[in-house]
Amino acid sequence: MKLDTSGLESTAPIFRRSDFVFDGLQMTPSFDLPNPTDFDGFQKEAVQMVKPAKGTTTLAFIFKHGVMVAADSRASMGGYISSQSVKKIIEINPYMLGTMAGGAADCQFWHRNLGIKCRLHELANKRRISVTGASKLLANILYNYRGMGLSVGTMIAGWDETGPGLYYVDSEGGRLKGMRFSVGSGSPYAYGVLDNGYKYDMTVEEASELARRAIYHATYRDGASGGVVSVYHVGPDGWKKVTGDDVGDLHFQYYPVVPATVEQEMVEVVGA
């Protein structure tokens, strides 16, 4: 007996590559994917977004009694001053500070992220993270995002079991250890004052005055720096804010107004 299987045949349509569905997919606009063997080259060839010029002045240096950290408070986008009250010295923990230079959002986010990781390290290991460890942690994080448009130039300053520590970290993952740094568009002017007046055996008062004067002179010459000069001291007992002075008041302190003397010359007129 032969069974009739004609009723079991499928009547569903079979789409081939040439059908309209696949033709529509082929017409969909696409974009280039990065070459995994030359990712950095792909980033260089990509069209960059408009990035307004940024500017700031921050500095930090190690001396006999700890680390002195100072910064201005102006935020700018190109020639536009967007704020005069930005907090550019960020408290990571009670014994460690970070500075902001570059993109405000990038610096604030990654400092906040670093503070969380430092706290988790403290809870897991029952001891505070060292300045060396915190700076290395931030550098490793930023290195993973290199070439992705981050703008970060920060200093990590603090006090740990080994004493004072100071590191510079940038958005490419670079990390430098040093005794004094200045970062930002006003740093060339700040370096001039800092290098001229720096001594390791300064008192806290002398160090804070040097930091304040260096930031002020940078704001005097650099249009992207200004606002308020904030100075912090990091010592064995943690960080403490020393001063916060408006640069306008500091101008009259460093350059006091001296009344000009007007000399009147008497001229005898001889009549004809």
Curated annotation (Swiss-Prot):
The keyword Cytoplasm applies. The keyword Protease applies. It comes from the Eukaryota. It catalyses: Cleavage of peptide bonds with very broad specificity. Signal peptide: none annotated. The active site is at 56 (nucleophile). GO terms for cellular component: cytosol; nucleus; proteasome core complex, beta-subunit complex. Residues 1-55 form a propeptide. The proteasome is a multicatalytic proteinase complex which is characterized by its ability to cleave peptides with Arg, Phe, Tyr, Leu, and Glu adjacent to the leaving group at neutral or slightly basic pH. The proteasome has an ATP-dependent proteolytic activity. This is Proteasome subunit beta type-5.
